[in-house]
Regions:
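Short pre-active-site segment immediately N-terminal to the catalytic Zn-binding motif
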Residues: 75-91
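N-terminal accessory alpha/beta regions
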Residues: 1-11
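Soluble non-cytosolic domains of exported or imported proteins
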Residues: 19-23, 85-86, 90, 114-118, ...
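Post-HExxH zinc-binding segment in Zn-dependent metallohydrolases
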Residues: 111-151, 220-222
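Inter-helical turn/loop segments and adjacent helix faces that build the functional surface
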Residues: 82, 104-114, 133-140, 196-201
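Active-site recognition of the HExxH zinc-binding catalytic motif
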Residues: 89-103, 121, 125
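Pan-zinc metallopeptidase signature
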Residues: 156-222
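Auxiliary, metal-adjacent structural segments of Zn-dependent hydrolase domains
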Residues: 10-69
Length: 222
């Protein structure tokens, strides 16, 4: 029989914190709607399974993804200390994705090129940081300034790549790239663009194309 003790403990932890999680979600959605309007979202909550346990741990006990303009999945491991503090940020990140779902073609993940993906994740992270500036995510400090420049020099020629496995390796890390390379570069790229164009509202920059965000940033492909 497979060992399900850990899974049972995670499920029990979610059930124990049910009211806390619900309140966090309600307050976070209120914060999010102050800048971007997207009502009637459905948020699905589940435990981290054995296959996802590593990445959930790397992300501080919360891993989430957007599966439509109205649907967000939260995978939680309450056994990992600090997950409560990261919960609002994770929801806000996916909320921005949900808002941009049709604009950014997020419904066709396999059709996204590397530039689409890097800018999409950077936008979502920037939005979450606007709401929760004191929260630090693992990818915020995954690369030093020198590391960001070096990794950009390696991947900038691949911006048009639609190779799903190559993109995943860059975004999350692989034998060839440090952990969270794509997320770190994406956040820094979008941050550099929007700090220089502070007059843009979240609604405006959420609807800007990846190419224009890249052009506005300090990151250059040449």
């Amino acid at each position: 029989m497979p060992d399900t003790t850990s899974l049972d403990s995670i499920i029990s932890g979610i059930e124990t914190n049910k009211v806390l999680i619900e309140n966090k979600i309600i307050h976070t959605l209120t914060d999010c709607r102050g800048y971007l309007k997207n009502d009637s979202l459905t948020i699905y909550i589940g435990p981290s399974n054995k296959r996802m346990k590593g990445i959930v741990g790397d992300c501080g006990g919360i891993y989430s993804w957007c599966i439509g303009n109205k649907d967000i999945i939260l995978m939680i491991d309450p056994q990992i200390q600090g997950w409560i503090g990261l919960l609002p940020f994770s929801i806000a990140h996916q909320y921005q994705h949900a808002y941009s779902w049709t604009k950014m073609n997020l419904g066709a993940l396999l059709a996204m090129n590397l530039m689409d993906r890097i800018v999409a994740e950077g936008k979502a992270d920037w939005y979450a940081h606007v709401l929760y500036p004191d929260v630090k995510m693992p990818w915020d400090t995954a690369l030093s300034d020198e590391g960001l420049q070096y990794q950009w020099s390696r991947i900038k020629a691949e911006m048009r790549s639609e190779d799903y496995y190559q993109i995943q390796g860059i975004m999350f890390g692989s034998d060839n790239y440090p952990e969270f390379t794509g997320y770190s570069v994406g956040f820094d790229l979008v941050q550099s663009a929007l700090k220089k164009n502070a007059a843009l509202t979240p609604e405006q920059w959420s609807n800007e194309s990846p190419a224009l965000i890249l052009e506005m940033s300090e990151y250059k492909t040449q």
